[in-house]
């Protein structure tokens, strides 16, 4: 019997695309203090830290000019220095990873800044390539990713759902089950939002200058601040799912997926 193929473990894709003319830099916000899973970014998964896996996934994306770890922790800086990774020590006052990306953007010039979450150990170069293909359209100010939502995640509030129009423009992001299947048809296509973002600097500057928005507070989803302020977010689809690690259970699930690849 052939090995089971899941949305986390798919066949290798076609050869990489050529680097475009957009200068893009990935920033990995990396803080040591995490409430639900302390020091999670330095936790080892199958012999490698979470940060190691995320950093090297980003380094494998040929469309990126550079990858920078942005941290408020000297311990993480020391880890990066030992590995020869590019890293910046940033303020410990930031409310979100986006604010940390914004600080880096003030001193490192690029056309596009990509926010790669440090707690996404299943990140792949293909995620970033797909996102940067989207950003080749200069009218796109903010880009992100979606993937078909598995049945186990449709009603899961920790799996954020996204609804888009026919052009890929996001209509809404929610922890609720959207769209709602009023007539119980059972044929609704649900999409899970993946936490990779690409921003052009002027729009990133505006975002960090706005106060927290009403919908953002309600859903605890900062991307809703863009939508409430009239900024379109375009969403590209990828077949590669990921898991954001917030708990020990998430960590074990990732370990199982990685073992299945070996």
Curated annotation (Swiss-Prot):
Transmembrane segments: none annotated. The keyword Amino-acid biosynthesis does not apply. The keyword Signal does not apply. SUPFAM superfamilies: Nucleotide-diphospho-sugar transferases. Pfam families: CTP_transf_3. It catalyses: 3-deoxy-alpha-D-manno-oct-2-ulosonate + CTP = CMP-3-deoxy-beta-D-manno-octulosonate + diphosphate. Its main location: cytoplasm. Pathway: Nucleotide-sugar biosynthesis; CMP-3-deoxy-D-manno-octulosonate biosynthesis; CMP-3-deoxy-D-manno-octulosonate from 3-deoxy-D-manno-octulosonate and CTP: step 1/1; Bacterial outer membrane biogenesis; lipopolysaccharide biosynthesis. Keywords: Cytoplasm, Lipopolysaccharide biosynthesis, Nucleotidyltransferase, Transferase. One of its GO terms (molecular function) is 3-deoxy-manno-octulosonate cytidylyltransferase activity. InterPro entries: Cytidylyl_trans, KdsB, Nucleotide-diphossugar_trans. One of its GO terms (cellular component) is cytosol. It is found in: Cytoplasm. Its EC number is 2.7.7.38. One of its GO terms (biological process) is CMP-keto-3-deoxy-D-manno-octulosonic acid biosynthetic process. Belongs to the KdsB family. Activates KDO (a required 8-carbon sugar) for incorporation into bacterial lipopolysaccharide in Gram-negative bacteria. NCBIfam families: kdsB, PRK05450.1-5, PRK13368.1. PANTHER family: 3-DEOXY-MANNO-OCTULOSONATE CYTIDYLYLTRANSFERASE, 3-DEOXY-MANNO-OCTULOSONATE CYTIDYLYLTRANSFERASE, MITOCHONDRIAL. This is 3-deoxy-manno-octulosonate cytidylyltransferase. It comes from Koribacter versatilis (strain Ellin345). The gene is kdsB.
